[in-house]
Amino acid sequence: MMRGFKQRLIKKTTGSSSSSSSKKKDKEKEKEKSSTTSSTSKKPASASSSSHGTTHSSASSTGSKSTTEKGKQSGSVPSQGKHHSSSTSKTKTATTPSSSSSSSRSSSVSRSGSSSTKKTSSRKGQEQSKQSQQPSQSQKQGSSSSSAAIMNPTPVLTVTKDDKSTSGEDHAHPTLLGAVSAVPSSPISNASGTAVSSDVENGNSNNNNMNINTSNTQDANHASSQSIDIPRSSHSFERLPTPTKLNPDTDLELIKTPQRHSSSRFEPSRYTPLTKLPNFNEVSPEERIPLFIAKVDQCNTMFDFNDPSFDIQGKEIKRSTLDELIEFLVTNRFTYTNEMYAHVVNMFKINLFRPIPPPVNPVGDIYDPDEDEPVNELAWPHMQAVYEFFLRFVESPDFNHQIAKQYIDQDFILKLLELFDSEDIRERDCLKTTLHRIYGKFLSLRSFIRRSMNNIFLQFIYETEKFNGVAELLEILGSIINGFALPLKEEHKVFLVRILIPLHKVRCLSLYHPQLAYCIVQFLEKDPLLTEEVVMGLLRYWPKINSTKEIMFLNEIEDIFEVIEPLEFIKVEVPLFVQLAKCISSPHFQVAEKVLSYWNNEYFLNLCIENAEVILPIIFPALYELTSQLELDTANGEDSISDPYMLVEQAINSGSWNRAIHAMAFKALKIFLETNPVLYENCNALYLSSVKETQQRKVQREENWSKLEEYVKNLRINNDKDQYTIKNPELRNSFNTASENNTLNEENENDCDSEIQ
């Protein structure tokens, strides 16, 4: 682009003999003027004062007019022949070393007073520099610029920054990059009174042409000085694409939370436009199998669903093709070839197998599966069709698992299980059905599938506690456990003890507890002898402070009561009802209400009546405290209930503030009273005696503390022996007896606690 501009400049300077002769006369006149102005050019003020890059030079009468007329015809501003071409040759890298050196020398400044008669060009010259030129004319430009370099034998580069001029040493070939590295804030001045400046009024940082254009100034009152402006836009690093800058005027929605568009990472295929293949009914029966394979291969193309407007026609062609394949499998019976198995499995892998990153909350907090909403797959229209097509393919009566097992192998199963971590519940539901069908078809893969699922559960329990598909895997296992043959293998019992029971300790139990409870009940139905191990495992992981999780455990215990055998119930009744008694006294009314609702179950009620001699003494104190509070409420009337102090005392004494809980506890005690009144009276008497003993121990403890306080008041420090002495001997004896009584009371309490346990 610069070559054409240089060619026009050369033509202008060499166009007429009159212009060349006049220029020689101008050079001689300027040499005479330079000798007179050398004293003034040595002043630093004149060298650094020209910040606007203006140029003042004398022009010849004939030569300038002729060049001006030619410049107007070509759409450019008049220039001064060879000297102008040497200055403008700095706009781009010269084609020859001579042109680059001459252009850089013409841009430098001389302290000794040597001047050059360069005249700056205007913005029109910059526009002309973008046009295409011939390479041969750039060589002429180099020769013309070298002649101008001879006129300046000792150039010195001076860069002014922050009103301070720094002079460099004499360089044989000063370059533009050297000037750029100095980052000048003021133009480079020359003593001759001419200046070369770049046109940066457009302010474009994306300017691809690093042009330093010369322009004529209209202000003649400025001091005659020559300078070079190196614009910031000419820096090489600023030519790189810059990031989008925020507009301060625009309003930013800082409250809006970012949205994740997909829970997995698909890799779209290279864009290849799809063409609609003919329908199956449009071809002959012999061509349907090749057409089937061609349609399956066509579905291997992946689309980017992050851009809804991208290739809408291609997405629709793929969806309709999958629908045609599904309809063809359902409505036709034919023998599947080996090639069909390979292409179908390959298409399933390409469309569905992909890495699934861990879920991350876009706000920045830890992802909570209970509160954060899952992100659905944007490509679900195609994924759903692929799942349905593969499911129809596997369920088809023409499917031969002997041929398919070389394609649906262990690696296929592992990748399929990884997809269960998808956040999209629709995909997990399709995966559940697909894996279950594969488990039923491929007998050789059953043990591997169970073992792989066990590994996922173990990693979930003891390492990550994050996996989205636990509920779906447990649902598959529920149907698998239901089909176990009796007696159960040791492998299945180990799975119950080491996998299913420890699953209760995970914090996100609520996501899969119904499926887990179903698996536990299925095991107990298969083998009732496992009841003791299951109940003791639940009591081991029983929550201490999480009331919501405690209600889940109580629901599971209720399900176990439905299938428990009477003989197995006897083995676990003591530890189980000790925990249930604690739940009855729980301040959380839903926990107490859930336990007391067991008495509405007829089977549970029969078990309690048959084993009342063991059960009633354990739960009687908890039930009696609730009923005594109900009697207190009835005796005092409604006024006492409205009293806030009575409500606080009620919550402390009875363990529950809900009156409905008191009524349910009274109903449970009434059942025991009616079925076995003798046992009820014995338990009542035992409870009252224990209450009296507790009161006596409380009074005795208070007396002992009072004696101890009196003993401390009568102590005095013996400074000689550093021992404590008692002033009154009677107090010494009373203190000794009080300490002995405290020791005996503590031993009695420990004995009572051990007997209850």
UniProtKB/Swiss-Prot annotation:
Gene3D superfamilies found in the cross-reference section: Leucine-rich Repeat Variant
Bias kind Basic and acidic residues: ranges: 23-34, 160-172
Entry's localization field: Cytoplasm; Nucleus
GO biological process: cellular bud neck septin ring organization; DNA repair; establishment of protein localization to chromosome; meiotic sister chromatid cohesion; meiotic sister chromatid cohesion, centromeric; mitotic spindle orientation checkpoint signaling; positive regulation of autophagosome assembly; protein localization
Chain intervals with Acidic residues compositional bias: 746-757
Keywords for the protein's UniProt record, in alphabetical order: Cytoplasm, Nucleus, Phosphoprotein
Composition skew (Low complexity), residue ranges: 12-21, 35-66, 86-119, 128-147, 197-216
Family: Belongs to the phosphatase 2A regulatory subunit B family.
Protein task: The B regulatory subunit might modulate substrate selectivity and catalytic activity, and might also direct the localization of the catalytic enzyme to a particular subcellular compartment.
Protein name: Serine/threonine-protein phosphatase 2A 56 kDa regulatory subunit delta isoform
